[in-house]
């Protein structure tokens, strides 16, 4: 989330994304409040759900034949995309990414502290650090 040093450059892995799934953070926060549950426990629940959906998507897509996208999977459009038409595309998917997105970060701050993210971003940074650490564990 933060550069390791001044020479730290972003690295973009993969040439395709199997599908981003977005967390609506203020809805999760509000659900935690109304059900008297811990916000982070509920956030873990949704992060695990997203992880399982991504794994299922990888499994499902991996069974597809290269013929579904000849340019990508048989003619080199994707990295490793030199398969035969009847080959499964599973080996190519290891270069694809799966995204954990988020939305409503400012609204989350407003619910938590009554202040916008510009006034006080400490909770936003805390939540994003938590999400980042969890995704790193996956």
Report residues per predicted region.
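Contiguous, well-ordered alpha-helical segments that form the cores/surfaces of helical PPI scaffolds
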Residues: 98-111, 129
